[in-house]
Amino acid sequence: MAQEPLATKGNFLHIYDFIVEKGREDEFIKLFEEFDYSDGNPMHKSSAQVKDGVLCRDTENPQRFFLIAEWADIVEHARIRKILAEEIKPAFVGLIEGRKFVPKYVEVVSSTPEEILNAAQPAE
């Protein structure tokens, strides 16, 4: 299987970094998945989303989570995030300490070109 960069140069990642209330981590994951996989998630309907997000859990602190996804347009992501925060209000956000669910945006400034990744593959 060919290697693939995590993201493409020129796009953006949103990185949410948050702490879930102690003892409610499994409930948080369940509520997150219920919302994320539903038709009610407007993020999945945006053409600006390049790669769907992944929810990650810190290996040293089980209360700490990260949500990372690739977007072509962070202005569009911020617009949809505002709708989530002010109108939809997903239940999983209620389990985040401080109820703060705001990402850090970062630009992808380097991504290994496909021809270099392909050349690095072992012969079959």
Short names for language-model regions:
Residues 34-51, 70-106:
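An amphipathic, aromatic/His-enriched active-site/gating alpha helix that lines ligand/cofactor pockets
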Residues 13-14, 44, 64, 82:
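Structured catalytic/translocation cores of nucleotide/phosphate-coupled proteins
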Residues 1-10, 48-66, 89-124:
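Glycine-rich beta-strand-turn "strand-cap" elements at beta-sheet edges
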Residues 19-32:
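Short, surface-exposed ligand-recognition loops at beta-strand->loop->(often short) alpha-helix junctions
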Residues 17-20, 57-59:
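Structured beta->alpha junctions
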Residues 26-28, 63-65, 77-79, 113:
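Short acidic, gly/pro-rich beta-turn/loop elements at beta-sheet edges
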Residues 11-19, 66-68:
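Active-site-flanking beta-strand signature of metal-NTP-handling nucleotidyl enzymes
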